[in-house]
């Protein structure tokens, strides 16, 4: 596709809850990918995410586009909540990446991240672009919150 917009709590996700491996998410949008905002009805943030909550390995998120924009709490991530290994996040944006803003109702920061909140190892975060903008509370992050690597 040329343009992909995920808005108002919309999500693309690949999850694993047990011992099996999670699937991968590949996004190819020649012009732009936008991940924007929160839905007060569902309480969800707009997100492209691969996550594992069990012992299985999480999938990867690979985005190829001209411009990636994550605003008002929107984000792209791979996260581990279990003992499995996290997937990798790779963003190839030929023009620019912009990450900015905090969604005021949920206080969710816009983010590009790979992280672990349990015993599993986090994956890597790779960003390739000509112009990177991080502003107004936006965050690019790799982190370990618990005993993971």
Could you describe each region identified by the protein language model?
Residues 1-149:
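Extracellular and secretory-pathway beta-repeat/beta-biased strand scaffolds
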């Amino acid at each position: 596709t040329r343009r992909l917009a995920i808005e108002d709590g919309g999500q693309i996700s690949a999850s694993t809850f047990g011992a099996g491996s999670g699937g991968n998410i590949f996004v190819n949008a020649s012009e732009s990918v936008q991940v924007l905002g929160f839905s007060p009805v569902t309480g969800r943030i707009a997100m492209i995410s691969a996550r594992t909550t069990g012992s299985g390995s999480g999938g990867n998120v690979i985005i190829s586009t001209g411009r990636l924009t994550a605003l008002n709490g929107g984000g792209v991530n791979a996260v581990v909540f279990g003992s499995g290994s996290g997937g990798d996040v790779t963003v190839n944006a030929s023009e620019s990446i912009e990450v900015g803003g905090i969604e005021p109702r949920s206080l969710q920061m816009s983010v590009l991240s790979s992280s672990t909140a349990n015993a599993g190892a986090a994956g890597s975060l790779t960003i390739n672009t000509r112009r990177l903008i991080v502003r107004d509370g936006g965050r690019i992050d790799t982190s370990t919150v618990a005993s993971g690597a």
